[in-house]
């Protein structure tokens, strides 16, 4: 099974920041704006892809001051996260509007995966 997530803002892919400076820059871009978290999954068996799934969540971030951003980063240290936030921790409080699955936002659309596994009697 393979899973990956891509954060997209204004037709730009926002990579995992890796450090505080890039994290601040990303959050400043997203502040007050709408972006998308895209989650893709695939299952392969015997050298064949037997299932794929793709889901998108739409998120609108609150307006954040530099102090807000620095306070948030000090709590969650989201340096290895698409979009520079950990939605499952304090990141969820950064948003004014969210459309889509929290699992897609977190990078694993578990709902779609479980439906597939149940329908095919893997679980």
What are these regions (language model features)?
Residues 1-123:
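Anionic-ligand binding patches
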């Amino acid at each position: 099974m393979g899973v990956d997530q891509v954060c997209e803002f204004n037709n730009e892919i926002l990579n995992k920041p890796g450090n505080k400076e890039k994290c601040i820059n990303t959050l400043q871009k997203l502040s007050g704006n709408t972006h998308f978290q895209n989650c893709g999954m695939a299952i392969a068996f015997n050298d064949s892809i037997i299932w794929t799934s793709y889901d998108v969540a739409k998120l609108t971030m609150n307006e954040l001051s530099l102090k807000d951003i620095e306070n948030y980063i000090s709590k969650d240290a989201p340096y290895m996260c698409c979009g520079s936030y950990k939605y499952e921790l304090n990141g969820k409080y950064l948003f004014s509007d969210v459309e889509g699955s929290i699992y897609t936002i977190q990078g694993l659309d578990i709902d779609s995966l479980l439906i597939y596994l149940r329908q095919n009697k893997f679980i």
